Amino acid sequence: MEKKAKKKEQRYLMFLLSILLSSCSIIGLTNDFGKLTPTEKNKIISLKKFEKLSQDTIYKINASQLKQELLKYESAMVYEFTNGCSSEYCRPLQVYENYAQKHHYKLFLVMNGFGNLDKTKSQTVTSPLFAIDGDYYKKCFRSVYTRYFDNELRDKPLKDKDWLGGIFIFEHGKYVKTLQDLPKE
């Protein structure tokens, strides 16, 4: 009789646990596109070309497209970031815009997913917003397609696992260095 009661209790606990877990929402495992509202989804499109970019749109991009565009600029800075990041290395986007302007960099702001999109959209920036196109890399996990994007930017094998930072500096389209944080001034 005791075994039957214990089994029933275990089933009940499993049932409660499954209800609890089904109501959880994990942000950042994938690109989180499915968690966006229909209105937000409509404002995200694949980049066709770098002309007439709207402040109201987020453009999905891959590193190959970006590298082609980087060739047009003497100096460029790519900041690949996570929306709503609270790390010591994450600053408001305006800080990156100010730094790029002061140092004559063309700035490209590239999100690595769509979770916490409201935290980015609530900031005032003049630069267009881009997002890594995970579908291009045929990977659904954010950590994987972000690594592939970063490595392709640096002309490294896609599967290399060394993370050096999210700020990429280019001169005449050639990768120069990666930074974790903006230099102190």
Annotate each predicted stretch with a short phrase.
Residues 2-13:
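Bacterial N-terminal signal peptides that target proteins for export
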Residues 13-23:
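Bacterial N-terminal signal peptides
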Residues 25-28:
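Bacterial signal peptide processing site
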Residues 34-54:
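Post-signal peptide N-terminal segment of mature Sec-exported envelope proteins
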Residues 68-86:
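Short active-site neighborhood of thiol/selenol oxidoreductases, capturing the structured segment around
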Residues 89-130:
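Structural microenvironment flanking redox-active thiols in thiol-disulfide oxidoreductases
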Residues 123-163:
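Short, internal strand/loop/helix patches
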Residues 163-178:
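A short, hydrophobic beta-strand/beta-hairpin element that forms part of a small beta-sheet core
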